[in-house]
Amino acid sequence: MKKNKLLLLASFLMLLSVSLTACYDDKADIAFYSGDQLNDQVGTCTNFVSSVTIYTNSSSQTENLGIAYGKGGYQALSSDAEVVKVAIEGDRLLLTAGGKSGKATVTLTDEKGNQALLPVTCGTGAKEIRCTKQTGVLPIKDGQVQSDIKESVAQAMQNYAPMTAGGKYVLIFKDMSDIEKGGRLLVYKDAQASAVEGTFEYSLVEEGNRPRPRFTLTYGGETHVLEVPESGEISTDSRSGIAIIPFTFQENITSQFKEQNPKFTLPDGVEVYYLITAIIKNEIIEIQ
């Protein structure tokens, strides 16, 4: 289980990682790559790098890239050292955040005068979870929607909608390299809503066949616990593992349902969930 937990966390952190990889059809005169060794199979997605994003709210603010196809004797120059600083160590290019948010271009030159340009973006990183569909409230037992009471349950909770299509959660991490540290939260209930501030925490649910992500969101005097359901557990538009986009978030609201509808008796084993479909992506944001 510990191994599965680490693998899952690693998969999730891949969604937060620095933007590095690109696809190339042919070898360039000078190229950059991530990792220790170049994988340059023509016509495939390799570890070539066409641009870099460095998050200033990360414990790791330096990127170490390999240099391929050059002639040695490298020199590097940043168009704005306040955004990104550069250094050369043999055939490696070191990029370090300069402390200023923005974009810069790194120019690398070899001893033969060949050049390569690398766009770099630095800034505060966040994860945006944007709701694309409000599935709504569903009664579920053993992963199956209970169709016989579906409409009555939905009617009873018709006003429950903490997040709707077009809305989003913006998660500003304390450390983009360590999601478990949590961070600051901005909630936009819909596309026109103003931001409501709060905090979020991240953990893994150790139930079922594999650990699953859980976000505890606290804002506006309320706490909402969103989980990614076990793959195949709930049939919606998106069956999701951790790294599939879009995917489903679910919130167990059985307690709220019973409190608000004391005369409604749920069948044994049935729980009530609020579901949304979301797309996630990394963002560079302006801190207000």
Predicted regions and their residues:
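N-terminal start-of-domain structural block
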Residues: 2-3, 23-25
